[in-house]
Amino acid sequence: GVDLVSLGGTKIGALAAEAVIVTDISSSRGKALAEALSYLRKTSMQLASKMRFVSAQLNALFQDGAAVALANASHANSMATRLYQGISELAQMHPHISIPNRAEANAVFPILPAEITERLQQSYRFYLWNQATGQVRLMCSFDTSEQDVDGLLSKLEGLLRG
């Protein structure tokens, strides 16, 4: 089974909230994990003095059966799928790029030539995931629009054409 779940709140609409969820705090293992995480949070400077205000964002997103959180996450994932499909189509026409992994959540990891990455970064904010291979990390979130995705794909296609 799963002991921990990590939740990135910024991808679903929170300003600055992340969560680690212990799935079974009734077990001795779950209790030990929860205790260790509480201590780790303090020692790694992740305990804000007014944490309840940060946490309130997650509480709001997960009210009413988590409808808002699920809708926002689903949207982010669908935008990543759109981005993945577009880059996959470009990769079929341009041997200089590839996309080795499917988009399974809200992230896409294509491999681009360094000069394309540098020029694309002049218009879009993302970073190099693996310098040795040229793999970049492109993230979609609750507020990524179809126009955002299509704009990046259009820019990338233009750069590939030269």
Which residue stretches match the model-derived regions?
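Conserved C-terminal alpha-helix-loop-beta "cap" of PLP-dependent enzymes
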Residues: 81, 87-161
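Active-site C-terminal subdomain of aminotransferase-like
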Residues: 1-92, 98-107
